Amino acid sequence: MNNREKEILAILRRNPLIQQNEIADMLQISRSRVAAHIMDLMRKGRIKGKGYILTEQEYCVVVGTINMDIRGMADIRYPQSASHPGTIHCSAGGVGRNIAHNLALLGRDVHLLSVIGDDFYGEMLLEETRRAGVNVSGCVRLHGQSTSTYLAIANRDDQTVLAINDTHLLEQLTPQLLNGSRDLLRHAGVVLADCNLTAEALEWVFTLADEIPVFVDTVSEFKAGKIKHWLAHIHTLKPTLPELEILWGQAITSDADRNTAVNALHQQGVQQLFVYLPDESVYCSEKDGEQFLLTAPAHTTVDSFGADDGFMAGLVYSFLEGYSFRDSARFAVACAAISRASGSLNNPTLSADNALSLVPMV
């Protein structure tokens, strides 16, 4: 913030109901300049909205994908090249967007930095994400471009047999485009990035975040390698076993290998590691601290798709709330369980209270 913005914030703290013309008189500037400064403070996340409600709660900035998710489920076990009966479902998606949505459901103040096209999908995604409680003022609309789309096909056993991720638009989320939100990021309590970002955008995040804890979702083994040289800048990492192999650089064939790989990443600077395992259990490891395995609580399962996004949101929420490492892991596992209990990518019943009610079962 510049000095003028700090002066305006100080005035608003003393009198949140003050009029813009009164602020202008106090600072001996025009009312239009006051309005412009207030708009800038809203964009930077220092003012939540109308009424000059100041943001005192630490907020999270999520930098990552927003896309339309199209998911088809065939009625057979082994889909072939022919047309098959089944169901097709479209929903707002994207790793970054899903995590931001879940954080809003948990009650946190969250900002999403991403890019959309100027098409129907883009407009729908922005509106749905805004309605969820996510601040989308940092999402940039690019004219003449199509919004990112994710297409997945599953069999009748709910196993994904093919997925296509058209996120080329994210290549245009450059540091130059992101610079408009640099002050917002610098004041965040936590920054979360997903590995759909370009190497240049990830570098921008890690460099600008500096001392702010950065959480990273590796997304897939095809994209995990982007952060291999940034491990010293990562506070919390949530890889799968194949993604952990990429980051470690060796095959993992046993629990001992997994533990060695985790410790190797700790030595490079990662503070917290949560390895998402195929059976939906999680191996949790804190640098110079605890290491343990958590299993999913007994809970209704409707669709596992997106549960890991619920898990990551739980990690961010519990970190901002000051939970211990073990309690943070337990809370995140509970969030993932609630996410699996819905056919939607973001279970509308996800809340901090509902997650805490499951924690004793974990």
From Swiss-Prot:
> What's its top-level EC category?
transferase
Source taxon at top rank: Bacteria
> Among its keywords, does the record have Transferase?
yes
Query: EC number(s)?
Result: 2.7.1.-
Pfam family for this entry, one:
HTH_24
Q: Give one GO term, molecular function aspect.
A: kinase activity
- Which keywords accompany this UniProt record? Kinase, Transferase
Record-stated family: Belongs to the carbohydrate kinase PfkB family.
Q: This chain belongs to which protein, by name?
A: Uncharacterized sugar kinase YeiI
Say which species the protein is native to. Answer: Escherichia coli (strain K12)
Organismal lineage: Bacteria, Pseudomonadati, Pseudomonadota, Gammaproteobacteria, Enterobacterales
